[in-house]
Swiss-Prot record:
It is found in: Plastid, Chloroplast. The gene is rpl4. Keywords: Chloroplast, Plastid, Ribonucleoprotein, Ribosomal protein, RNA-binding, rRNA-binding. Part of the 50S ribosomal subunit. HAMAP family: Ribosomal_uL4_B. It comes from the Eukaryota. Pfam families: Ribosomal_L4 (PF00573). The lineage of its organism: Eukaryota, Cryptophyceae, Pyrenomonadales, Geminigeraceae, Guillardia. This is Large ribosomal subunit protein uL4c. InterPro entries: Ribosomal_uL4 (IPR002136), Ribosomal_uL4-like (IPR013005), Ribosomal_uL4_dom_sf (IPR023574). One of its GO terms (cellular component) is ribosome.
Amino acid sequence: MGSNKIKNLVQYEIQDFVSLNKMDTKSHDSLNLNVSKKSRYLLHRVLTNQLINNRSGNACTKTRSEVEGGGKKPWKQKGTGNARAGSSNSPLWKGGGVTFGPKPRTFSNKTNKKERLLALTTALYLKSNNTKVINLDNLDFTNLKTRDLVIKCSNLIENYKKDQKILFVAEPTASGLWRYVKNISNVDLIYTTGLDLKKILQAHHIIFTCKALNDVKEVFNEQ
């Protein structure tokens, strides 16, 4: 991903969260983080490292020694009028080896734990100013339909547009929620044990469960 796209992710405008209790807005909590340190610079740095670490690095080309065939000299050294050639595997020949081509490698780049934690803290802080949080704890997942979830979320989020991304943040025990969001293209789900900086920055609206909200506050309010 280019540098401009990364900067666009970091510079997302702060979006409002939505409040919900039993799929309504009668009561809500807020994500008010008490943090002393924030770093927009680390947002870019940690996000860049995250994208780099996701690269597979499996591009591979063959050198002249790895190309099949080419063991016989194409023509004799002198007397033909052609340039001298020793093998059809030469990089000068079509179908020959590649000079200095890419080989499988790792692009992994270490990110310090404190830096990653501060970047997540900054992202959550920017997203939490004057926001509300959805409480899904009393939601009956056994009878919930994906279609109903889409309709309710679109009705609850003010000025919601179809191209806006919604991110659910839940505790690991709320695995049943994944069944209802996995088929929606602009809706994603992450758990508090694996907060994803890129997804947080990309999201226009973030929906917390009550348990996930408490877990996030417990960790990030100490920063």
